[in-house]
A protein has these predicted regions:
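N-terminal pre-domain/capping segments
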Residues: 2-130, 200, 204, 214, ...
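Short, intrinsically disordered, charge-balanced linker/junction segments flanking boundaries
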Residues: 240-244
Length: 244
C-alpha cells in the first residue's frame, strides 16, 4: 500500500469519520457522519519479536520502542500467569489474541467434528483473552478451496460463528472476523452482510488493511463495514511486488 494512501486511511480512522461506536445491533443502519474521536493504540504480534530475550525482557523491549500492546496466538502455550506478570511489570497491554486453529481446522469445514474442534478452541480463546485483560479474539471465518465449495463454506461458517454466541455472551468478549487470503468473503458488501446475518454486538470485523490490497481498497471496506470494525491489522504490502 502506498504510504500516502495508508496515512490518509489511518487519519480517517483516527478522526472517527467512518467508524461509529460499537453500541447497537448490526441490523440497524449506521450513519457515516463523524462521531466521537478515536484514539488508536499500536501493538504487534508476539512472533514478530525475534530477539533472544526472556519473556519479561521482550515485553520491556516492546514498551521501549513505543508499542502499547502484544497480540498472542491462542490457545496460549505460555502460562497465563507469566503473561500477566510481564504485563503488570511493564504496562504492556494484551488486548487481543489470534485463534491458532481456524486455518488448519476451518469453521467452514464440511466435517462437523472439525468445525466443533475449532468452535471449542475459539471458546477457550475467549476465556483466555478475558483473563489477560483484553477484549477480542481474531477468527478467520472460513476457507474455500477445490474441495470446499463457496456456498458450503458460507453456510458452515455462518452456522459455526452463531454457535459461538453463547461463549461471547458468557465472557463478554468480542470476536473479530478477519479477511485473509482464504478465497472467502471477497467484498466489503459480503463482509457486511455476513456480520449482519449474525447480528450480535460482540461479533464484528477485525479488518486487515494490508491483506485487502490483494483484491480491494481499504477505504472501500472501512466505509462499508463502519461500526462493524472492532480492531485493525496493518502491514507493509506492495501491489508492484505482487504483480511482478
Amino acid at each position: 500500500m502506498e504510504r500516502k494512501a495508508f496515512i490518509q486511511t489511518a487519519a480517517l480512522l483516527a478522526t472517527g469519520a467512518t467508524i461509529a461506536p460499537l453500541l447497537k445491533g448490526y441490523g440497524t443502519p449506521v450513519s457515516n457522519a463523524p462521531t466521537q474521536k478515536l484514539t488508536l493504540k499500536k501493538g504487534l504480534g508476539f512472533g514478530m519479536i525475534e530477539e533472544d530475550l526472556s519473556l519479561l525482557d521482550k515485553f520491556k523491549l516492546v514498551k521501549d520502542i513505543g508499542f502499547d500492546g502484544i497480540e498472542f496466538n491462542s490457545p496460549v502455550e505460555i502460562p497465563l500467569k507469566e503473561l500477566l506478570a510481564a504485563r503488570d511489570q511493564t504496562g504492556i497491554e494484551l488486548p487481543s489474541v489470534v485463534n491458532k486453529d481456524h486455518w488448519s481446522k476451518p469453521l467452514s469445514d464440511p466435517d462437523a467434528s472439525v468445525r466443533q474442534f475449532t468452535i471449542d478452541s475459539v471458546a477457550k480463546s475467549l476465556s483466555e483473552v478475558k483473563e489477560l485483560g483484553g477484549d477480542t479474539v481474531l477468527v478467520v471465518p472460513g476457507v474455500v478451496n477445490d474441495k470446499v465449495p463457496y456456498e458450503v463454506a458460507y453456510k458452515n461458517a455462518l452456522e459455526s460463528v452463531r454457535k459461538l454466541i453463547p461463549h461471547v455472551e458468557k465472557t463478554g468478549m468480542k470476536i473479530g472476523l478477519e479477511n485473509v487470503w482464504n478465497n472467502f468473503i471477497l467484498s466489503p458488501v459480503e463482509a457486511r452482510e455476513f456480520v449482519d446475518a449474525i447480528d450480535h454486538p460482540l461479533i464484528g470485523w477485525y479488518f486487515d488493511i494490508g491483506n485487502i490490497l490483494r483484491y480491494g481498497w481499504p477505504e472501500h471496506w472501512i466505509t462499508t463495514l463502519n461500526s462493524r470494525i472492532v480492531k485493525l491489522h496493518a502491514k507493509e504490502f506492495s501491489r508492484d511486488k505482487m504483480n511482478n
